[in-house]
């Protein structure tokens, strides 16, 4: 849009555009705009008014310039005259079209916020089935002559048989099994939830889970099952002891599975929940805050339970030497904090229009001839004020480093920056940005006021410009303010076991603003001896605008401090302060907006917002510690299983992925390995260590139940006769290695020394190679005869390749199509190899029936704050820590 200065000559006044650019850029732009105006002079004079008036257009790209009239009609000319006819309309033009600048606001990263809020206590670990590795399976029985009987026998086999071949790979399989158990390990087991009806029961009894019921059905229907076992199954039912809140359920489990589930039952994480626990769960500062009225539901059932969150502090010290990881954590904390900092809505702020009118009157804008003073009003809007308020508090809560964006020629921004540096500790700003801002304030306002020469600051100087100026300035009030600002640091205080970064008491109660105002008034009274009068007047007017709002600035400082400290009570991780890799940008024009538009309305977080913020922090912190425990356990297990090829980096990557917020591929390798080293130093949590020891003690039993691998192979120079085996018939299987010289297959492959094997075979001594090998079955007699000469011995001696070894199970029994070729027993089948395969554990019903005990019933509550109803006092009555209203200026 356009506005006019009455009585001004169009030819004499320069075009004033691009007010926020540096002077060099401004000159180029002014020349361009003047040329454009000269081309349009004649057209405008014809189409608008005959009087000589200046038309100044705003150069913003995103605003359509109403002053650019393209062959407009007479009605459009009338509308333009109406807009310009009153002073009020004229000021609205200034506010909305010319002097208003859109400040880029923070774009909330919803995906990160959602990831944080989606981290919940592990409800998925509420099991509906018992943990099982084994299941019983029926296998046929073979007679002495190799014919299959009609009878079957039950053996324990793996539910999911995915064992690889090779000793190293098998150990890696056990590591993956351990990892899977850690993921599935339940925090609590309530057998009543998983119990199902026993179909064979006489009195509608229940067994512990559906798999137990299926096993009972299969055994009950098996013709080989004894009558006493059937009667026992018919009597299987739960036993309830209501007075003790206990129930026993019958279960069918392999002894190893029973050991796991018994351990889970005896080491549950649930604890009794009562009102005292809920009371202590609420942060103490929220409980004691008179602005919040909390009421607790006292009707907790006696069966209420909860899982205590794991809130250990600083186990990995990610703030120390993990720049990339720490930056991600602080970024996600910043996004979360911004979502909970209350908004300064337009109704809580002074009307932007009214405030700009008042500022225009204070500045006497009608008489302005200096371009810099028009910038005082640039960028003042409620959106920028709200953005600044949220940025300051969220950055302090998350300890995110801020960088300042400002224009040196905008004195109002620099004066607002003096308030900012007074209130916000220096640590919060990027060092380079802080130095640039301080240097601009010193060279634009402070030194010119006293007639001192410009400060020439050396890059890399350990002192900041304010620290240098403090030593050189003689004026007590200004030096006193500089001293406070230079020493404005967070005080580290441990509250409720959490390291908090607290503000200086003078900032919390707002008294420091009086110190700032004394310094500003001293500066405005100085003569600026080396500067023109207009320069001095501009600075004085800027200071006047800020000093007119002394009361509001005190209130603003108290409001920022109160909101910060109240939300800080909900932070559960230590607030470690380290400069972050990336920074949050803060424009000083938005600080001006906040200073100028803050009203007398108190804005404090709602209790629901506080509870939400607290819950999200607790859930993330607890999940963080649990995932650390998992990673430490996996690293320890990999070392104890001698997984020398295992890449520890992959374990660390899995750990970071499970924390949800990290973009793992972007994390530098050096930080990955440093993280690995820190994880190695931590002790393994007790439950996880016990579970690993259970696996370690039973590895052989688990291997034995697999159909995929054999435990070794016996090779000989002369043929060995096939023997009868009850599970397979006539086969080349050895069930023990008694009498054989044994060599570890993994060691053999690592060393490559086959001389010992060759010598033993040539001396006609069979040798047993012990290790996990693929268990391949072949039942054809024809193929057996064909392979008599293709012995493993030939491969060992000639090819020197043990990894090609695939022992074959030669089946000669009634299942074979060729069985009747050898039924006369005149020909005795032989083989130069024997497969060493351990016998799986037979299924014994009596040994597999276990009674499991758990609570009859309890209810686990994940959100303890749901029992608390909360409200706030009237915001206008809200008081700060000093028992005075937060906002005193009414």
From Swiss-Prot:
Posttranslational modification? Sumoylated with SUMO1 and SUMO2. Sumoylation of viral proteins seems to have a positive role on viral replication.
Q: Provide ranges: composition bias, Basic and acidic residues.
A: 19-30
Q: Where are the residues of the annotated region Hydrophobic?
A: 404-424, 432-452
| Cleaved signal peptide residues | none
Region (Disordered), start-end ranges: 1-46
Q: Give the matching Pfam families.
A: Rota_VP2
Looking at the UniProt record, the site noted as Interaction with the intermediate capsid protein VP6 sits at: 232, 236, 849, 851
Q: What exactly does this protein do?
A: Inner capsid protein that self-assembles to form an icosahedral capsid with a T=2 symmetry, which consists of 120 copies of VP2, with channels at each of its five-fold vertices. This capsid constitutes the innermost concentric layer of the viral mature particle. It encapsidates the polymerase VP1, the capping enzyme VP3 and the genomic dsRNA, thereby defining the core.
Q: What does the subunit comment say?
A: Homodecamer; each decamer is made up of two conformers of VP2, called VP2A and VP2B. Interacts with a VP1-VP3 complex. Interacts with the intermediate capsid protein VP6. Interacts with NSP5. Interacts (via N-terminus) with NSP2.
Q: What is this protein called?
A: Inner capsid protein VP2
Q: Which organism is it from?
A: Rotavirus A (strain RVA/Human/United States/D/1974/G1P1A[8]) (RV-A)
């Amino acid at each position: 849009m356009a506005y006019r200065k009455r009585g001004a000559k169009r030819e004499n006044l320069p075009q004033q555009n691009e007010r926020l650019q540096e002077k060099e850029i401004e000159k180029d732009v002014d020349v361009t705009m003047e040329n454009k105006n000269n081309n349009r002079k004649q057209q405008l004079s014809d189409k608008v008014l005959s009087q000589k008036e200046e038309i100044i257009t705003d150069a913003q790209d995103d605003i359509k310039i109403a002053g650019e009239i393209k062959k407009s009609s007479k009605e459009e000319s009338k509308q333009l005259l109406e807009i310009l006819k009153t002073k009020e309309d004229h000021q609205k033009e200034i506010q909305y079209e010319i002097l208003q600048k859109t400040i880029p606001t923070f774009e909330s990263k919803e995906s990160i916020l959602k990831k944080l809020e989606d981290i919940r206590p592990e409800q998925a670990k509420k099991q509906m089935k018992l943990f099982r590795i084994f299941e019983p399976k029926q296998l046929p029985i073979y007679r002495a002559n190799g014919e299959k009987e009609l009878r079957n026998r039950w053996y324990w086999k793996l539910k999911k048989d995915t064992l690889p071949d090779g000793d190293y790979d098998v150990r890696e399989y056990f590591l993956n099994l351990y990892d899977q158990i850690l993921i599935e390990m339940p925090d609590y087991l309530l057998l009543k939830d998983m119990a199902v009806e026993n179909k064979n029961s006489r009195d509608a009894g229940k067994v512990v889970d559906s798999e137990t019921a299926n096993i009972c059905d299969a055994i009950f229907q098996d013709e080989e099952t004894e009558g006493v076992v059937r009667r026992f199954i018919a009597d299987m039912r739960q036993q309830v002891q209501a007075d003790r809140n206990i129930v026993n359920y019958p279960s069918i489990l392999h002894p190893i599975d029973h050991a796991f589930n018994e351990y889970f039952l005896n080491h549950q994480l649930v604890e009794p929940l009562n009102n005292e626990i809920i009371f202590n769960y609420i942060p103490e500062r929220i409980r004691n805050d008179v602005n919040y009225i909390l009421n607790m539901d006292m009707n907790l059932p006696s069966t209420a339970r909860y899982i205590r969150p794991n809130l250990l502090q600083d186990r990995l010290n990610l703030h120390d030497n993990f720049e990339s990881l720490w930056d991600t954590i602080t970024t996600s904390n910043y996004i979360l904090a911004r979502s909970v900092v209350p908004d300064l809505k337009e109704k809580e702020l002074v009307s932007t229009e009214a405030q700009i009118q008042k500022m225009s009157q204070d500045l006497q804008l009608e008489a302005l001839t200096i371009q810099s003073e028009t910038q005082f009003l640039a960028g003042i809007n409620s959106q920028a004020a709200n953005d600044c308020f949220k940025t300051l508090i969220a950055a302090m809560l998350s300890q995110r480093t801020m960088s300042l964006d400002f224009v040196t020629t905008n004195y109002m921004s620099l004066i607002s920056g003096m308030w900012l540096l007074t209130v916000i500790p220096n640590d919060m700003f990027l060092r380079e940005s802080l130095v640039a801002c301080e240097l601009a304030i010193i060279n634009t306002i402070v030194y010119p006021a006293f007639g001192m020469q410009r400060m020439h600051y050396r890059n890399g100087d350990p002192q900041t410009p304010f620290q240098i100026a403090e030593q050189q300035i003689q004026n007590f009030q200004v030096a006193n303010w500089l001293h406070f600002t230079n020493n404005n640091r967070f005080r580290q205080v441990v509250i409720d076991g959490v390291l908090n970064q607290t503000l200086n008491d003078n900032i919390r109660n707002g008294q420091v603003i009086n110190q700032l105002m004394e310094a500003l008034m001293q500066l405005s009274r100085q003569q600026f001896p080396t500067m023109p009068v207009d320069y001095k007047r501009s600075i004085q007017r800027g200071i006047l605008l800020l000093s007119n709002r002394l009361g509001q600035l005190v209130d603003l400082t108290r409001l920022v401090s109160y909101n910060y400290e109240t939300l800080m009570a909900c932070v559960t991780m230590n607030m470690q302060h380290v400069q972050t890799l990336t920074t949050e940008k803060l424009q000083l024009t938005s600080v001006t907006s906040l200073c100028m538009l803050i009203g007398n309305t108190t804005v404090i977080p709602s209790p629901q917002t506080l509870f939400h913020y607290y819950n999200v922090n607790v859930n993330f912190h607890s999940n963080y510690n649990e995932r650390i425990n998992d990673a430490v356990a996996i690293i320890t297990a990999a070392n104890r299983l001698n997984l020398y090829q295992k890449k520890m980096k992959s374990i660390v990557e899995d750990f970071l992925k499970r924390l949800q917020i990290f973009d793992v591929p972007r994390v530098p390798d050096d930080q990955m390995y440093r993280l690995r080293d820190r994880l190695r130093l931590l002790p393994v949590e007790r439950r996880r260590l016990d579970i690993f020891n259970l696996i370690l003690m039973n590895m052989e039993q688990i291997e034995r139940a697999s159909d995929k691998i054999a435990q070794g192979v016996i090779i000989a120079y002369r043929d060995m006769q096939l023997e009868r085996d009850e599970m397979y018939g006539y086969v080349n299987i050895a069930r023990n290695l008694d009498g054989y010289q044994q060599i570890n297959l993994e060691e053999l492959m690592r060393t490559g020394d086959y001389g010992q094997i060759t010598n033993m075979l040539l001396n006609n001594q069979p040798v047993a190679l012990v290790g996990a090998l693929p268990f391949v079955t072949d039942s054809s007699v024809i193929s057996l005869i064909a392979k008599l000469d293709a012995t493993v011995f030939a491969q060992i001696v000639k090819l020197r390749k043990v990894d090609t070894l695939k022992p074959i199970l030669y089946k000669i029994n009634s299942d074979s199509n060729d069985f009747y070729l050898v039924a006369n027993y005149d020909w005795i089948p032989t083989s130069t190899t024997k497969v060493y395969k351990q016998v799986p554990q037979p299924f014994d019903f009596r040994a597999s029936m276990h009674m499991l005990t758990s609570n009859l019933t309890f209810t686990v509550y994940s959100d303890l704050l749901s029992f608390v109803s909360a409200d706030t006092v009237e915001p206008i009555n809200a008081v700060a820590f000093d028992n005075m209203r937060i906002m005193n200026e009414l």
